[in-house]
Amino acid sequence: MFSLSLPKLCAALSAGVVFWGAAAAAPGGSASPAAPEGAPKDAASILRICAAEKQPPFSLEDGTGYENKIAVALAEATSRKPQFVWSDKPAIYLVRDFLDRKLCDVIIGLDTGDSRVLTSRPYFRSGYVFISRTDRNLSVHSWSDPVLKSFGHIAVSFGSPSEVMLTEIGLYEEDMAYLYSLVNFRSPRNQYTQIEPSRMISEVVSGNADLAVAFAPEIARYVKSSTVPLKMTLVDDDAARSDGEKIAQRYDQSIGVRREDQALLDELNEGLVRAKPKIDEILASEGIPVLPVTN
């Protein structure tokens, strides 16, 4: 495995909505794609993977992120050597600051159909989950459950569907100070700010939060490793705003490449078919609940 570190990029930070993702599988045949402009001369034998240095459990510079493992499995399935191009920024900036600048060629971790890139067909689907202590004996499956309004604190990620629904059921204002306390009261307005997935789980374990609601892939690792038994329940996909607009709770996950890199995408789709057993093993080891893909 190769590892390539790049100097810090100095683009101004801006607050944004967070998107989650991973990779996909699809048929299709093509010759090895030509090297993108700016790629090394031996690019056809290397898979340059855009990755965040410190975004657990997705990506970590030591390669222990589950998306790092998926990237390696995909590279091996395409007979390429994985080369990680590391960013010291959150993954939300990888498309703009790395992929679009042709510093790397592939992102593991995008929702299927992300309009900024070409995405492969999904290789797995998962959803948001309610996390609680097992000894609480809670049985919450939907944002429409009235029991939610009896809870003291519910931990959710900023910019997530869970934050939207916390607002919709009228609990966000009273929970806001608590949520900001989890990031030392840093505002996400002028900088990227997010609650660490591990912190959300520790809040449930300690009893500071009655419930956490998060995308299963970002917290499954911590639920699985918790010394206090925790219950993880998929959120029913019936959430909606007061005006009837659906707030999706489940997402297909894909690999992303630049819009002009169709040949590379075709090759990756073929590789994903071959890598599927290994990818499924990685997801199972992580404890991520998977659903049938729909796209």
Where are these regions (language model features)?
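Periplasmic-binding protein-like
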Residues: A52-Q55, R125-N137, N184-R186, K224-L272, ...
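Bilobed "Venus flytrap"/periplasmic-binding protein-like clamshell domains
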Residues: E53-P56, L60-E76, F130-R189, I195, ...
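Bacterial N-terminal signal peptides that target proteins for export
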Residues: M1-L13
